[in-house]
């Protein structure tokens, strides 16, 4: 007689808090709800990032914080360090895609999370991120020519249409030397004074000053009664709530730009980055020196600016790159 033994192993999850109602149901079932030996990821990681100080650049810290906030929106406050698994990361990656986040941005989040988890645990986190995209893919052309900008500018729209706001934002970004959408969203009225618009880039903290042009003032004047923010995108002073609003508005903005392109008969793909890249390209064609373009964009390294201009088939790029290399 042959005896067969079957063993069942049960893992009991005891609630550490309430399951996140916004998380996919199957993920809630995977999250150990109480794990005293495993601290909560978000609050622990924030402490770790704040302790890094000058050991990492400001832009790197911002990347870490942005990725952590994004993961918190997906998985909630109660996610513990030990809860992060391949299953969760793959589901998070799919969620990012569903939110309209580009593959390169998703990859940036994943690389940041991998680095933070490695610093928190002291362990090799490479296996944990196996199968999750952490590379850098070549992006499609982001810049458009001056004729496309003029066509968008001349499009007939109702003054109170949401698309009119989207167009104003696109044009303002172009007029303000490629001002990023996130910085327009958080721009406050007190940052505009004595004919200057002054802001610090959210991504790097770089201070940028732009001379206020009449076309910029015209756009600003349309939203005078909307509150402390220059544009009617954010409606709270709470940092986390404002960030969540920003993400929602970013998704709206990208969708609105696609509608604007359709109405204007524009074949190029318009995104939140298009105006910024288009300004850089126009400045380059106007023979503005590369260091000046870099300063206007808030790039500390002109090499970063070259990535904006790489799509231009122009021998001057090669010469500019040689000059940059010879500087160091």
Question: What is the meaning of each model-derived region?
Answer:
Residues 213-267:
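Active-site/catalytic core of tyrosine-dependent DNA strand-transfer enzymes
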């Amino acid at each position: 007689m042959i005896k067969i033994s079957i063993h069942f192993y049960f893992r009991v999850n005891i609630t550490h808090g309430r399951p996140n109602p916004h998380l996919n149901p199957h993920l809630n079932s995977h999250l150990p709800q109480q794990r005293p030996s495993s601290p909560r990821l978000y609050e622990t990681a924030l402490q770790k990032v704040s302790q890094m100080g000058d050991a990492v650049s400001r832009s790197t810290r911002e990347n870490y914080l942005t990725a952590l906030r994004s993961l918190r929106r997906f998985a909630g406050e109660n996610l513990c360090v030990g809860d992060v698994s391949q299953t969760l990361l793959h589901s998070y990656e799919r969620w990012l895609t569903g939110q309209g986040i580009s593959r390169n941005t998703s990859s940036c989040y994943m690389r940041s999370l991998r680095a933070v988890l490695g610093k928190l645990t002291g362990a090799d986190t490479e296996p944990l991120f196996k199968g999750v995209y952490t590379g850098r893919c070549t992006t499609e052309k982001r810049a458009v020519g001056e004729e496309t900008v003029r066509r968008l500018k001349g499009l007939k729209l109702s003054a109170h249409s949401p698309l009119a706001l989207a167009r104003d934002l696109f044009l303002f970004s172009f007029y303000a030397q490629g001002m990023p959408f996130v910085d327009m969203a958080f721009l406050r009225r007190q940052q505009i004074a004595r004919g200057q618009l002054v802001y610090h880039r959210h991504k790097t903290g770089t201070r940028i000053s732009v001379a206020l042009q009449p076309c910029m003032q015209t756009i600003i004047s349309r939203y005078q009664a909307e509150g402390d923010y220059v544009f009617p995108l954010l409606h709270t002073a709470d940092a986390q709530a404002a960030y969540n609003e920003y993400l929602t508005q970013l998704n709206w903005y990208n969708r609105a730009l696609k509608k604007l392109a359709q109405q204007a008969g524009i074949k190029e793909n318009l995104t939140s980055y298009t105006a910024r890249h288009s300004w850089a390209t126009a400045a380059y064609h106007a023979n503005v020196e590369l260091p000046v373009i870099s300063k206007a964009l808030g790039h500390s390294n002109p090499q970063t600016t070259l990535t904006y201009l790489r799509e231009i088939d122009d021998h001057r790029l090669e010469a500019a790159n040689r000059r940059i290399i010879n500087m160091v």
